[in-house]
Amino acid sequence: QFSEAGAQITNSQAEVYGQDLVLKINPPTEEEMEFLKPNAYLVSALQINLRDKDYFKKLAEKKVNAIAFEFIMDEYRQLSLIRLIGEIAGGISILYASELLAKSNGLMLGGITGVRPTEVVILGAGIVGEFATKAAIGLGASVRVFDNSLSKLRRLHTLIDSRVPTSIIDPKELKKALMRADVV
């Protein structure tokens, strides 16, 4: 399908990273950087706060124009690419958990008439947590969300459904929820 649309398919890292423009979700590894050509454009989550100076010196030495997409703002000064990735990650995490439940325990994530719903504990009420919550509820799971931010919990409570239990992270409450959870 991609090749029919004009894309070239290759297994060669040198070919992939040797282009004028490289788009990559994760930052390139040291090995992958070797293949970047001078003056190429790299658009990636560079995770600047997790990298040392040498990483960026190497990019500079190769004269790579690196754009950290985690800092690209839209016209409303929102980090919309990061939000989008969080939305995708939240939804996919629940779909993946559903698949693992089915393969390992023979359980379904969704609610089935007469069967106790699967219990899902979500740690974090940010964008990823919001979309994980939406996906889990959509599949019929019983969901509980924990976060240390009261404002994030309020926001989630308003956006999702006031019937979804939310809680500040209290060690005793969290431990009880984790012991009962089918998915975390």
Predicted regions and their residues:
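N-terminal beta-loop-helix "entrance" segment that forms/cooperates
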Residues: Q1-Q8
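General beta-strand structural signal in soluble alpha/beta enzymes
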Residues: I9-N11, K24, S44, A66-F69, ...
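Glycine/serine-rich phosphate-binding loop and adjoining beta1-alpha1 elements at the start
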Residues: E30-E119
